[in-house]
Amino acid sequence: MSDGTGVRGRTMAEKIWEEHVVRRADGEPDLLYIDLHLIHEVTSPQAFDGLRLAGRRVRRPDLTIATEDHNVPTTDIDKPIADPVSRTQVETLRRNCAEFGIRLHPMGDREQGIVHVIGPQLGLTQPGMTIVCGDSHTSTHGAFGALAFGIGTSEVEHVLATQTLPQYKPKTMAVTVDGTLRPGVTSKDIILALIAKIGTGGGQGHVIEYRGEAIRALSMEARMTICNMSIEAGARAGMIAPDDTTFAYLEGRPHAPKGRDWEAALEYWRSLPTDPDAVFDEEVLLDAGSLSPYVTWGTNPGQGAPLDSVVPDPATFSDPIERAAAERALAYMDLQPGTPLREIRVDTVFIGSCTNGRIEDLRAAASVLQGRKVAPGVRVLVVPGSMAVKAQAEAEGLDRIFRDAGAEWRNAGCSMCLGMNPDQLAPGQRSASTSNRNFEGRQGRGGRTHLVSPLVAAATAVAGHLAAPSDLD
């Protein structure tokens, strides 16, 4: 549609994209200016080596922020890192940041944490920005109305050298979630339900904009959970239009605009939401009121179902590729079709990650664990997403609730989300995890992962099997 002048309305993604195009040429990707570049120890070393070989410097070190998160241990952080590969990567990041003048939040620093937790926490993430990081879950920052996506190591080098990035313009998808969530149903359940609905390739080539009354009702931290897992639906990025909830979260944060700059920023930010007459390439509808707690049963985030249901029978899948994938998944997960999901027992519960390691997530888990005990034989790791989140949780007494229940209270890091640090599953162990990926071996070779919300994770810790808080009453 157009406004009567022949000019079609634009989506939020289109507005931000067009405002950041540095150069455009027929048959070539657009060259985008990048407002914020986040880096960590895993995907940056080769990029810095490339700069040295070419004799280049970092063009905008002031727009580049580094943290240590993927490989860092979450215990004994005052001691040297035991794993030699992890230690080398962390030490290399420190040397590179010192050489090229990049601000680094090292292990133990109050502002250290998972890269997608500290960006918003510090007010670095702002509406209308282009944000990149050598990490799949950079889409988290889209919760603020930013265009944020993950990039590869060669692209990390390109951004370091030029503060630009060549990209082909993606398509747009609107996911509208109307209605009201029932008690015990969270933003994690929304995104797991969406991925189960459209599949892990349903958003391929698109930027997803999440809309609707259920999205508007979410806090910023809940919105970040949804945008974080956009990549698990195959999307390039996920976004939510900025509103008063966004502005209230940002105001007063260390890197947020101040004074007159704040007022000017608000004026710009309010211009970003999608125009009423804009047209999306694809549209998907979800009814929030029909959703219930979701869990995954397989080995990709799209293989999920309501907790009230049973392990599906691959024979019921009409698509032969999906049927084969389900058969392989059930063999790996050691599950039988028809088994009630609530009967699946776990060895480990992990509460943390860039998906669900923020203060609201920890409060939710603590509300379930308070006055209760972890089931015998179940190990529970609670890992805050940043050292600032850890400090806030301890100020609120959440750490005591976790410890009293029998959980382990750790320092900040990616931890058991991925098998790149000491926090891993042993072969054959099964976890309920608030993270974002349940691939084979993701949490350790031979480990089996069920993705859940913090509420379900905490209830599972008490019950010893997949459970919702209502099951404990």
UniProtKB/Swiss-Prot annotation:
Database matches in Gene3D superfamilies: Aconitase, domain 3
Bound cofactor: record note: Binds 1 [4Fe-4S] cluster per subunit.
Annotated TM spans: none
Residues annotated to bind [4Fe-4S] cluster: C354, C414, C417
Metabolic or biological pathway, per its Swiss-Prot or TrEMBL entry: Amino-acid biosynthesis; L-leucine biosynthesis; L-leucine from 3-methyl-2-oxobutanoate: step 2/4
GO BP terms in the entry: L-leucine biosynthetic process
Group of enzyme by EC: lyase
Catalytic activity: (2R,3S)-3-isopropylmalate = (2S)-2-isopropylmalate
Cofactor: [4Fe-4S] cluster
SUPFAM superfamilies: Aconitase iron-sulfur domain
Entry EC no(s): 4.2.1.33
Family: Belongs to the aconitase/IPM isomerase family. LeuC type 1 subfamily.
Subunit record text: Heterodimer of LeuC and LeuD.
PANTHER family xrefs: 3-ISOPROPYLMALATE DEHYDRATASE (PTHR43822:SF9), HOMOACONITASE, MITOCHONDRIAL-RELATED (PTHR43822)
Name of the featured protein: 3-isopropylmalate dehydratase large subunit
Gene: leuC
